[in-house]
């Protein structure tokens, strides 16, 4: 059972909270707990709201992944935050441990197609004229034997994007048993660590940084993780 997510910021317009790994963002056919439902229950109880509380889902995160997510508390905030997703002013940056030795800097551009029936995403050649373009840039922050700690900046937001693109580049995420060499029970080494946006009403620039807990695969990377906050703003899209 999951508890109410840790909330980093809350006002009348939005909530920024931490998603635990393996918690659904939104309910599905499994009937398992989901973050949206937990936060709606929290709002309903805290503010004694009759009926179901409104909470708009602004962006998503794969179930095995943890990290920062923002939600809109009004329809106006939802529309404005969604517009920031489209124009790229709402930025989502991730920390990941990948298998292999990553380049110092790289930009990956691929065309992705999702198999809805199997919930799998694959890279396809561009000439097939199907699928959606996916772009991300990364910086290798540290190397350790056959593993790399990378800071990833998303340019687009496709399903399973980081997992699929990094695996296609020969750098599968540690613990990813869907697209990599992960084993059952391993926790995928992908964490939404930095979120930057403009407040939907005041326009104030807001930046949130929350590293993963020092456990599992993240143990031993603490010093390098602390240095990532200064790296993301410097990552540029190559080519």
Description of each model-found segment:
Residues 1-239:
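RNA pseudouridine synthases
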